[in-house]
Amino acid sequence: MAVTAALVKELRERTGAGMMECKKALVETNGDVELAIENMRKSGAAKAAKKAGNVAAEGAIFIKEENGVAVLLEVNCQTDFVAKDGNFTAFAGKVAAEALASKASIEELQAKFEEERVALVAKIGENINIRRVQFVEGTALASYRHGEKIGVVVAGEGDAETLKHIAMHVAASRPEYVNPEDVPADVVAKEREVQVEIAMNEGKPKEIAEKMVEGRMKKFTGEVSLTGQPFVMEPKKSVAEILKERGASVVTFVRLEVGEGIEKAEGLSFAEEVALAQKG
């Protein structure tokens, strides 16, 4: 039996799976929709597809390091409970190991582990997403994980303890750049415009406002850069001062936090659930 667009549409509506997945299932069953559904249920594809619409904003950051290269991987799920599940952590660890071994892109990792991901979704009943991967290279690397939620890798020069402490600082203080001079010109220009407007709205003449802004801009670039921030373990000193004292330096760093940029779905209140039930 020929696999028609109508059959593919029917299978998609009944399983919630993707078009190509449905077409493949129908080709394998010679157009038999019922058998295709049965096969997809057995493989977990139908169940996984239904879970795919669920927001996966929990999860964990995984770090692996070898021969001067470190990989940070974010894998998401829907609940903190599953983020600690052995099946989930084993899957993510396998993905991270492959990323480190092959320097694979996120798209390559997603494609390579799609079948295993689908099977795991079917097994644990939550949507799972291989979301982000980043690499850091350097002669001296230090990593730090704060629980499962935040992962940091720092590359630089210096003793292991100092670089580890810097990684902990990055986890806590969220710097965006290494040095104040690394802040992009467009970011500086945009912030300057805002600060000039604020100063002028305070009733200051433009020439005075401009001078005030210079001080504010220095503060701004310091706040968003690692070396300009007060060191979390010795707040009276900047990170730059700590690095100088210890004969260390930072070349680059990467900080990943679970769920950054993912919009979590708001749960319904009890009253909203009752109202919705009455409408139904």
Curated annotation (Swiss-Prot):
One of its GO terms (molecular function) is translation elongation factor activity. Associates with the EF-Tu.GDP complex and induces the exchange of GDP to GTP. It remains bound to the aminoacyl-tRNA.EF-Tu.GTP complex up to the GTP hydrolysis stage on the ribosome. The keyword Protein biosynthesis applies. It comes from Vibrio vulnificus (strain YJ016). Disulfide bonds: none annotated. Belongs to the EF-Ts family. It is found in: Cytoplasm. This is Elongation factor Ts. Gene3D superfamilies: 1.10.286.20, DNA helicase RuvA subunit, C-terminal domain, Elongation factor Ts, dimerisation domain. InterPro entries: EF-Ts_dimer_sf, Transl_elong_EFTs/EF1B, Transl_elong_EFTs/EF1B_dimer, Transl_elong_Ts_CS, UBA-like_sf. Keywords: Cytoplasm, Elongation factor, Protein biosynthesis. One of its GO terms (cellular component) is cytoplasm. Residues 79-82 are annotated as: Involved in Mg(2+) ion dislocation from EF-Tu. Its main location: cytoplasm. The gene is tsf.
